[in-house]
Amino acid sequence: MANIDKDPTKGLNAAVAAELRAERKAQEVTFDDLVERISLSRATTWRLLNAERLITIEALVEIASALGVSVLEIVERAEKRLAKKTPPPRRRGRRHALAMA
């Protein structure tokens, strides 16, 4: 089983990538325009925005700045996205306790 912290397609990394893509699209910034605004290569930017690679804080700052949005806002949105996808923890024994009452 893959470690969620090291797998770029899961967890917060994937949610951050999704939020960066959503922000780019909301602002109608083309991928090529974004690449021109930052120092990252086209291939690296593609991998980061598609959660194929773990995003560094430096890359996150650069991409967010190029889109005119704060890193905090992107991370908060990503956390909300994760919260929607994460089911609440299951409580064990509750059904059994109610049946005995």
Describe the residue ranges of each PLM region:
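Recognition helix of helix-turn-helix/homeodomain-like DNA-binding domains
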Residues: 39-54
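Short, charged recognition helix plus adjacent turn
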Residues: 2-4, 75-101
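The alpha-helix within a helix-turn-helix
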Residues: 24, 35, 64
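A short, Lys/Arg-rich alpha-helix, primarily the initiator
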Residues: 1-28
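Short, basic-rich loop-to-helix N-cap that marks the start of a DNA-contacting helix
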Residues: 52-65
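Residues within the helices of the helix-turn-helix
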Residues: 21, 32, 61
